[in-house]
């Protein structure tokens, strides 16, 4: 029996998550809630994507429904999770992709509406199980965990690298810089924003801003709390980002050892298919539509004075992330059967 899935927020993450897992046997997508544009816009943007191209299935709107190859998904336009009659649609699992509801208090209404599990496509500010697939998904306990977060795209890129280096060499401390594409938290032209740098036109500048990806690693490796920090630089591109990791490790190492550790990890469980390893001189566009979370740029690995390590990791910050989120959804769905 398939687990019935609803999506709240049908923007970049919501639409791509549906694309990624539409034909998976464990999941049945039954409802979409999106406050902007109605079913017509939802269907159109699901079919036609400026970054990821046309989706193969036929997609159309019919009244308050979206049809995918003739299969209907009901559609609503409510502003809050507790306004959506999830129980009427038989939804077991919600993918919360709006980016607006990120605390247990604002997410609790789902459970009052009969939803069994909620996976948030963003870090949750208070207690929730923070899962990075391939790194700590073994922590999921079906009877205990009902609210989960798939962390952030950059945390999903960084965590596999930290796992390999920390478990193989030991990390004393480190700083990361994510060179990250534009997102819809920015503005096309100058406009008011609480982050004055994000208030500036996205297409004209490199924009330093914050990222919580490095500090979030402490949720997975508590011994690294206060030992990692980072910054983001938003760049005028639409897809494929790069994480620049600098670590001080606990023992002497070499470029060859670092790359060997990362390559070996990419070829076996639990990181196979999640961590990649690349020796060709590729650039960001080559990683568009790559489903992996983190791809090592082996040509760029550096070691200085035996213990300072620099690693570059590419990632499709949209497609790679949603693939991990729906893999988490599948893991959760299997626990409900």
UniProtKB/Swiss-Prot annotation:
Matching PROSITE patterns: GAPDH
GO biological process entries: gluconeogenesis; glycolytic process
Principal localisation: cytoplasm
InterPro entries hit by this protein: G3PDH_Arsen (IPR054835), GAP_dehydrogenase (IPR052978), GlycerAld/Erythrose_P_DH (IPR020831), GlycerAld_3-P_DH_AS (IPR020830), GlycerAld_3-P_DH_cat (IPR020829), GlycerAld_3-P_DH_NAD(P)-bd (IPR020828), Glyceraldehyde-3-P_DH_1 (IPR006424), NAD(P)-bd_dom_sf (IPR036291)
Keyword Oxidoreductase found: yes
Residues forming the catalytic site: 153
Catalytic activity of the protein: D-glyceraldehyde 3-phosphate + phosphate + NAD(+) = (2R)-3-phospho-glyceroyl phosphate + NADH + H(+)
SUPFAM superfamilies in the record: Glyceraldehyde-3-phosphate dehydrogenase-like, C-terminal domain, NAD(P)-binding Rossmann-fold domains
EC number: 1.2.1.12
Keywords attached to this entry: Cytoplasm, Gluconeogenesis, Glycolysis, NAD, Nucleotide-binding, Oxidoreductase
Pathway(s) it belongs to: Carbohydrate degradation; glycolysis; pyruvate from D-glyceraldehyde 3-phosphate: step 1/5; Carbohydrate biosynthesis; gluconeogenesis
GO molecular function, one term: glyceraldehyde-3-phosphate dehydrogenase (NAD+) (phosphorylating) activity
Record-linked Pfam families: Gp_dh_C, Gp_dh_N
GO cellular component: cytoplasm
Family: Belongs to the glyceraldehyde-3-phosphate dehydrogenase family.
Role this protein plays: Catalyzes the oxidative phosphorylation of glyceraldehyde 3-phosphate (G3P) to 1,3-bisphosphoglycerate (BPG) using the cofactor NAD. The first reaction step involves the formation of a hemiacetal intermediate between G3P and a cysteine residue, and this hemiacetal intermediate is then oxidized to a thioester, with concomitant reduction of NAD to NADH. The reduced NADH is then exchanged with the second NAD, and the thioester is attacked by a nucleophilic inorganic phosphate to produce BPG.
Protein name: Glyceraldehyde-3-phosphate dehydrogenase 3
